[in-house]
Amino acid sequence: MGNVPGKIDQEDSFNDVRPDSSYNTTSSNSVIKQYDEEASSRVRTRRTTSLVNNILNGNNARTKTGSHLSSTSRRKTSREKELAKEAHAKQLVVRCSETVDGGFLAPFGCYSFEKLDYDATVVKNLIIKRKLAPFYTPLQDFDESWTRDELIKIVDGLPLHDTFDENLEEFEDVPIGNLRKSTFNELIDKSLSKKEQRRMHAKIFRARLYKKRILWQENENETFLERKLEMKRIGSKSSNVEDNTSSQPRKNYHLPSDDLKYTLYKNGSECPICFLYFPGPFNYSKCCQQPICTECFVQIKRADPHFPHDEVDPTEPQTNDSEKDPNLLTSEPANCPYCATASFSITYQPPTNRETGIGGMPADSYVYKDAAISRADGGQPNISAITSDTIRPDWEIKLNKERARLMRRSANATAIHISNRLIDPSHSRRRNTSHSITPIHDESTSASRSPEPTINELEDQMVREAIRLSLEDQDNRKKSKNRNTSLRP
């Protein structure tokens, strides 16, 4: 029924046909030798195929001690990534209780969520340490003719965060289900292919995360408005700040006093990139001393991993990216958006006339003073340069991951290519056809064929490739471990 006979069966068949065979003794021995070679070839092919599979599977799961990742492990990894994205989104919620010098620790929302891929913890720490300007609530325009009362009234009406578009076309007709449930597998159409189900899962997750961000920010907005109303109701104004006759401690609402509102916006300026009006002081580019708001600064980052842009020689054949060495992948530091100087960095000098919020006095206790407030340490602040790499410390990890991905793809292509050379159906058909017709003629003409690498040579080549990939992977893991150790505080 098409099964390949075993060696014992082969010998029995030879014994049965030998009395009626028309071949001479030399011819019979030649046929037996050919069958033995085919059986040995099948063993080598199975061994080589196993080696190919080991290379293919090993490159995809080298960090695991087992042979391959189970489906449960893959789902767990995917879920961990989703939880990390949710945690990052929560860090971007503007909270009225998290203020520094009249600004906030999270962005107002001038740019889309997808562009806010910086390390939120690093940025918050820089703002708290006053090494980076906080995220201020911007004004669309500013008129110098505004009086104090007019300016305070305008600032008092500013929202905590920019408004969301609740009906994005991207998420139209995408089911989100119950947001309180952690899973949503019941929303996925099981009649779709596995690939389409994964795409649908990713789209539903993005839609759910977008809706969650709206709800999280709306909750903070409600708290913000409630505190405003409560402050007005109890008559907590800047003129009554110095009244300390009551022994009962006053509640901290984390809201700016009228004096702080006026101080913030009366001497603000426009950001040259987004053209919005922000309070000062600004961040300044170290190279050309141009102002830039923090909303715009966190958008600037390194280029995505790519191969060097070599000059194209028309006389030389162009090399495809898939054929290039993955170790050549690079990612240049960001350039200055004003003067295009390489390795863009900014400096920030915090205000000396106000220090409120975290690390300072309560924002609603601030009283305007013409003279600058001297610092407690009596000296100038420690000004340090901040780069895009500072707020995205994982850029090198991402670069190495992309290199490893290209290495795996290249290794897979190499293994498949070698496997195809070892297991060539057309070659087998030609060999079997020639055997069935004239086995002796095949022996006489095989020497005239062009020389090809032997099975053992190809196996040795694959072993060397597997060893090389293993050493590269081990070296990358060692570098990543050392880098993570050095990044720990």
Swiss-Prot record:
GO terms for biological process: cellular response to glucose starvation. It is found in: Cytoplasm. Residues 461-477 have a biased composition (Basic and acidic residues). Its main location: cytoplasm. The keyword Cell membrane does not apply. The modification Phosphoserine is found at residues 13, 436. The modification Phosphothreonine is found at residues 183, 433, 438. Present with 556 molecules/cell in log phase SD medium. Interacts with NPA1, SNF1 and REG1. Belongs to the SIP5 family. This is Protein SIP5. The gene is SIP5.
